[in-house]
Amino acid sequence: MSTSGCKHLQLVQEVRPIADGCQECLTIGDSWVHLRLCLISGDVGCCDASKNKHATKHFHSTKHPIIRSFELGEDWRWCYIDSTFV
């Protein structure tokens, strides 16, 4: 994965996931398709294939740009601002 051009990687922190599932979906009793982990705050949210799209909503409310997959066997990161894998 190319990291060239993404200046937002410097914001990444060593985080602990705040929850084992999408925090917002757990609160409202809903389900999700896949999980994403915010690499700035540790927030766990559901993906855009999930009806609630909580990971993207977290980005819009906090401006935390870098997430990674929170699924077993997946090892990728995404920058919302640059719209690219990093």
Predicted features and spans:
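Cys/His-rich, Zn2+-coordinating zinc-finger modules
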Residues: 3-10, 16-23, 28, 44-86
